[in-house]
């Protein structure tokens, strides 16, 4: 599986098998601008089916976390090789 978006690859590697909040992902990536992160990392990863919400019916849930989908896990395993 090849993916051209390096931001999605980076996000998939960071999330891995964990469930992370936006704040946690920002800290690990080293970004400070939440809007930039959402527009260029998280939203494209969700739109392309690599990441999903822990509470999909409540996007603003106070304990919202993000995790990899099956497609995201497949990419994660490939990147770990």
Q: Over which residues does each language-model region extend?
A:
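C-terminal regulatory or interaction extensions
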Residues: 1-81
């Amino acid at each position: 599986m090849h993916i051209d978006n390096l931001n999605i690859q980076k996000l998939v590697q960071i999330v891995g098998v964990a469930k992370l909040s936006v704040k946690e992902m920002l800290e690990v990536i080293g970004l400070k601008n939440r809007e930039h992160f959402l527009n260029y990392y998280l939203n494209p990863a969700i739109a392309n089916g690599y990441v999903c919400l822990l509470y999909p019916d409540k996007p603003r849930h106070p304990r919202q976390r993000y995790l990899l989908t099956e497609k995201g896990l497949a990419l994660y395993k490939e990147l770990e090789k």
